[in-house]
Regions:
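C-terminal interaction modules of eukaryotic adaptor/scaffold proteins
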Residues: 13-14, 180-234
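Eukaryotic modular interaction domains in large regulatory/scaffold proteins
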Residues: 146-199, 203
């Protein structure tokens, strides 16, 4: 792996590694120029219960396309999902998205990974150069929730460079906690939860994975549901 990043390396950390990451970054920067409807991190926190509720409604979509019922969506099932939802991505784009969101490298997306993938698709369909259908992802009820997640990232990314830095996270938390002594620790904890690759910068995908955990959605939700179903039947 690469060496530890030094203080002056933030610009290097922000360079996208793949064509998909470059496209996500470009689309996010364009979206950030429009600003956020959220006024503070606290206003986002107040939306957590509703966001959690709406994301869990996505479970039915997940189960519909998990045709073999193994609790994960594989590449073939994702291709079928995109065709059914009329998401007009190329095979290369679909493969890249699958690889990007299959963070466990087990050739199957769990529920939380599927949510992240759909939200990335929602963002990418904001590309004015793309000729797509009226509903971005064929799931209009979920799109308002995804827009809130995009709004949240835009709120945090004060300098609109497509990444959230440690300083920006501290600033957002400080605005919420009104100078409480614990605010710095809270901000650092939240940032560390987001910064998976420890490069000091958080991209939109990292933010989404952290956010699903914040609202209570984990990658083992399917297993917990199965256990719960079994107990009820007994």
């Amino acid at each position: 792996m690469g060496g530890t990043l030094q203080k002056g390396d933030s610009s290097r950390a922000s360079l996208p590694e793949t064509k998909l990451e470059a496209k996500i970054l470009e689309t996010m920067r364009r979206r950030e120029s429009e600003g956020s409807s959220l006024k503070s991190f606290n206003s986002l926190i107040l939306k957590f219960p509703k966001i959690d509720e709406n994301l869990r409604k996505c479970k039915a979509v997940f189960e519909e396309f998990d045709t073999d019922g193994n609790g994960a969506i594989d590449q073939q099932e994702l291709n079928h999902c995109f065709r059914k939802l009329e998401i007009g991505f190329t095979e290369e784009e679909t493969n890249d998205l699958f690889e990007a969101c299959d963070i466990n490298d087990d050739r199957g997306m769990k529920f939380n990974e599927f949510i992240v993938l759909l939200c990335l698709v929602y963002l990418l369909k904001d590309d004015p150069a793309a000729q797509h259908a009226k509903s971005r992802i064929g799931l209009p009820n979920l799109e308002a929730t995804f827009e809130t997640l995009v709004d949240a990232f835009v709120l945090l990314d004060k300098n609109k460079d497509g990444h959230v830095s440690k300083r920006e996270m501290v600033e957002a938390i400080n605005e919420t906690t009104s100078g409480e002594r614990s605010s710095g620790r809270i901000a650092m904890k939240r940032f560390e939860e987001m910064d998976w690759d420890k490069n000091g910068m958080v991209n939109f995908k990292e933010f989404l994975f952290a956010f699903t955990r914040w609202v209570g959605i984990e990658d083992n939700d399917d297993e917990e549901d199965d256990e719960g179903d079994g107990e009820e039947e007994g």
